[in-house]
Amino acid sequence: MALTPADWQMIAKAALPNMGKYLEWRSLWREAAQAQARANAAALTPEQRDWTFDLLTGQRAYSAKPDKRYQWKVLPQGMSNSPTMCQLYVQKALLPVREQFPSLILLLYMDDILLCHKDLTMLQKAYPFLLKTLSQWGLQIATEKVQISDTGQFLGSVVSPDKIVPQKVEIRRDHLHTLNDFQKLLGDINWLRPFLKIPSAELRPLFSILEGDPHISSPRTLTLAANQALQKVEKALQNAQLQRIEDSQPFSLCVFKTAQLPTAVLWQNGPLLWIHPNVSPAKIIDWYPDAIAQLALKGLKAAITHFGQSPYLLIVPYTAAQVQTLAAASNDWAVLVTSFSGKIDNHYPKHPILQFAQNQSVVFPQITVRNPLKNGIVVYTDGSKTGIGAYVANGKVVSKQYNENSPQVVECLVVLEVLKTFLKPLNIVSDSYYVVNAVNLLEVAGVIKPSSRVANIFQQIQLVLLSRRSPVYITHVRAHSGLPGPMALGNDLADKATKVVAAALSSPVEAARNFHNNFHVTAETLRSRFSLTRKEARDIVTQCQSCCEFLPVPHVGINPRGIRPLQVWQMDVTHVSSFGKLQYLHVSIDTCSGIMFASPLTGEKASHVIQHCLEAWSAWGKPRLLKTDNGPAYTSQKFQQFCRQMDVTHLTGLPYNPQGQGIVERAHRTLKAYLIKQKRGTFEETVPRAPRVSVSLALFTLNFLNIDAHGHTAAERHCSEPDRPNEMVKWKNVLDNKWYGPDPILIRSRGAICVFPQNEDNPFWVPERLTRKIQTDQGNTNVPRLGDVQGVNNKERAALGDNVDISTPNDGDV
């Protein structure tokens, strides 16, 4: 019994532990597997053997044509035969004919076969051999469809000895009603475009009908411009023809500067194939030199596809010096120059057909230059989302209001105004890459995508550039760089002009709304900062689309708070999945001042908690008491030892009771809300969207911008002594039944007062009934002000504000 390859694999695996004999076993397995494969192949017929993929034998007889090494068994679902299998089968049947007549041109497309040769005698010999060979493969040719002539039809085109004429297409207008109807018609026209010399720009009104409602049954109408384009197609079809290529003669590729988009043709004493670019450009501004290079690359590929060789000559509308300049500035031209091994020229053939293609006047920049102009005036431009545009020339600032809310669009309008105002040599400095790149491309731009909102502005700038006589140089400068020098100063003047004008034109409500759109602060902050009414401030917050879903809800319960900063802190970890690896957000908050600190870290282990504590304490100070939940990182020995070393008292709340850390839990929600709101804000262009940067911006707003009812921010409450009532009281200690004071009041509550004895480290809470209020006068805390004192007659009664003395009350007075 012969061993199968699977058996030999089992033997090889069993021998793996013995590494010394591994190579020997591998060689034996290979030889046995090949022997078994040869034995199996011997039982196959020659036809079956040709279609078998022999992996183990190592033979490479069919490696040049990989498709022949596979046995096709599965047909596409729903088909009775496979077009691919049909092609492969007929190609294999035609192989003996190709080998017998190597000079014969034999083309196959599905069930159509074309035989071509210069000598009719050779065709007469090849045709009977073809019939005989196909009959051996079970294939028959319908003799009634055979055409033997110097002029024949193949794939709908008429092939004559010197030219190829496309099939005649009847264009009917009576059934053009829906998107589907126009799609079919334009598909036929696009298929015939290699026969037509109509530039793409002339057919644009026709192809623009396909835009709009995407449903195939959506209505469409034939516009006047589209009807005129359709008439041009009908006229071109009447005389459409291509020349037959002469294999012994070279051919060239010509790229013409037609309007808006270039047109190319493979040429050999006549058009061999017309090549057109895509009708709809991928970019808003299609730079004409790049479009020529892209079409030239497309033409080189078409030459290889149709004729099997590259043209010997490439003709473009540029001189040799201009080609070198474009190759250094454009990636497409660099690829074209390095990939084409032939000659590049700019002298077109003299032929009447080619006279149509010279109507694009400017194909190389003449007005926009690449180097600064020494004799040109320098103008700095800037635009803002408030619609204010400004430019600075010779120290003079000019501002203008536009009805736009995009900084790029406003700056485009400012540049247009500058080009119209300054007609002499001009240097423009802008802080928008978008505007600088657009202006550099517009002079020789082909098609400007009409769907863009700035298309109309770009067209106006292009017309102004084409009508100018003096050169223009435009460059970019980074805004808010803080660098010294006149360029940074000029840009800063233009930038400040947009803000000053916007502030002067806007009302306090509008200014508050813009400030809120940037930072999404609270209504109390807006009310204090911009002197608004409570209703106006609340309306701004409630009308904000980013803040309306985060409005506070009433809460119940209370957490113990510190009466001074750095007394009691709460700390916890929350998750922000959008931060990726830094999704573990550690948050700490001071329960007295409300100062908050957060660190996006890669985990929530004890080491990460310690890292967060050190970062927070280095920024805002070390608390006396730190309260957390019962998480494993907080209850670990490592963190407990860290707290002891740092002399921080660590407390944990009840297990599974997050309300014990309600202050930091609320801080989680507040911080996440600001991360979401400020992500939708106006800092997208200036602030990078990194996790730490986003957290820092939110903390800056919460700690330094939001204010309380007394007009203080969290940072101010944390870094300064809190406002205390200017009151001194004497108070009785119920433990020793003695009176103390006078001491200052820290906090008042219902029925109780918190006093801070001057000789104690901690404050005390005392019932309000056990206190006696003493009003101070110029720092004298021992002399209270009383309107009437025992022992003083009516004539000597003290007036309000007089200084009198009072003895310390005894126990009976209380």
Curated annotation (Swiss-Prot):
Other known facts: Reverse transcriptase/ribonuclease HThe reverse transcriptase is an error-prone enzyme that lacks a proof-reading function. High mutations rate is a direct consequence of this characteristic. RT also displays frequent template switching leading to high recombination rate. Recombination mostly occurs between homologous regions of the two copackaged RNA genomes. If these two RNA molecules derive from different viral strains, reverse transcription will give rise to highly recombinated proviral DNAs.
Membrane-spanning intervals of the chain: none
Keyword Transferase on entry: yes
Annotated catalysed reactions: Endonucleolytic cleavage to 5'-phosphomonoester; DNA(n) + a 2'-deoxyribonucleoside 5'-triphosphate = DNA(n+1) + diphosphate
GO biological process: DNA integration; establishment of integrated proviral latency; symbiont entry into host cell; viral genome integration into host DNA
Protein name: Intracisternal A-particle Pol-related polyprotein
Domain Reverse transcriptase residues, every copy: 1-159
Pfam families: Gag_p24, IN_DBD_C, Integrase_Zn, RNase_H, rve, RVT_1, RVT_thumb
Residue span(s) of domain Integrase catalytic: 561-733
Sites where the protein binds Mg(2+) 2: 572, 629
EC id: 2.7.7.49, 2.7.7.7, 3.1.26.4
Keywords linked to the UniProt accession: DNA integration, DNA-binding, Endonuclease, Hydrolase, Magnesium, Metal-binding, Nuclease, Nucleotidyltransferase, RNA-directed DNA polymerase, Transferase, Transposable element, Viral genome integration, Virus entry into host cell, Zinc, Zinc-finger
UniProt family annotation: Belongs to the retroviral Pol polyprotein family.
Needed cofactors: Mg(2+)
Disulfide bonds: none
